[in-house]
């Protein structure tokens, strides 16, 4: 139940968990408003980080995860095969809007003799807009996560591209454990990895198995390039 008008401020403070400012002039210091806006922008940046990763993982050549795609939905008017991560793209775009408000919030901190109201026009737009924007972004990310498609088979395929070249560190550490100096191990592994990378259809695992410097220390190399823990 909303209290009578005379107790309205008390009610709002209690609902929002706010306390009165113990030292203020005509206006409350705007550093706390700036802190609020920066916090919203930071949350938005985290959502942007998640959505950017989803967008990259949804690329056609990667396709390890994917936003839900409704029947009849269009990803591109020109390319019918596309299934664009529209929600994640929207989140990344709105995160930029949130970050743009941080500058305005910080510029509002310095007021003439701690009491002019130049901040007011900015805050009338900034505070409601950044609050509603973040709320919308959170709703969008919730929908993304709820409908996210995950493709373990494609993850395994990508890890095994070029014969498991992504496991080069495991080979490096295996050679070092077997007695090879780290500098020599790095040189040997890099040579075999780059050979697989630079040659179409190259195979890191086969390169290692054919390298006498490797086989003199490790056998079989498959133990160090397998995706499963050893």
Where are the language model's segments positioned?
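Short glycine/serine/threonine-biased micro-segments
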Residues: 4-6, 15, 70-74, 177
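Conserved protein kinase catalytic domain
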Residues: 11-13, 172
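Glycine-rich cofactor/substrate-binding loops
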Residues: 79-226, 230
